[in-house]
């Protein structure tokens, strides 16, 4: 494991933080694609869950912009995708009519 700075990942993490702010705090759920707003039971809860997803993903990406290890490119994207799939499944089970 070595410490190096990957500026592209820092920019991507900052974009995730901006989206987390707008979705989680400002409740701008129009930024989320792939759902019908009329079918959502609790839009505030959806915004909070999606905001936490973007915040956690941004923190994970930011951490990985400073620390690199062997196999990082094969491990990190599937972990974030699996986390996202879990959030999507949870939202579809609990928040969609």
Swiss-Prot record:
Gene Ontology cellular-component annotations: plasma membrane
Gene expressing this chain: yitR
Protein origin, superkingdom: Bacteria
Subcellular location: Cell membrane
Keyword field contains Isomerase: no
Keyword list, A-Z: Cell membrane, Membrane, Transmembrane, Transmembrane helix
TM stretches of this protein: 5-25, 49-71, 75-92
Bilayer topology annotation: Multi-pass membrane protein
The protein's name: Uncharacterized protein YitR
One Pfam family cited in the UniProt record for this chain: DUF3784
């Amino acid at each position: 494991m070595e410490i190096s700075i990957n500026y592209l990942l820092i920019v991507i993490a900052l974009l995730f933080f901006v989206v987390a702010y707008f979705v989680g705090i400002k409740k701008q759920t129009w930024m989320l694609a792939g759902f019908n707003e009329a079918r959502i039971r609790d839009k505030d809860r959806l915004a909070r869950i999606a905001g936490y997803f973007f915040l956690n993903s941004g923190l994970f990406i930011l951490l990985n912009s400073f620390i690199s290890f062997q196999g990082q490119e094969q491990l990190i994207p599937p972990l974030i995708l699996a986390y996202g799939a879990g959030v999507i499944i949870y939202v579809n089970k609990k928040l969609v009519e």
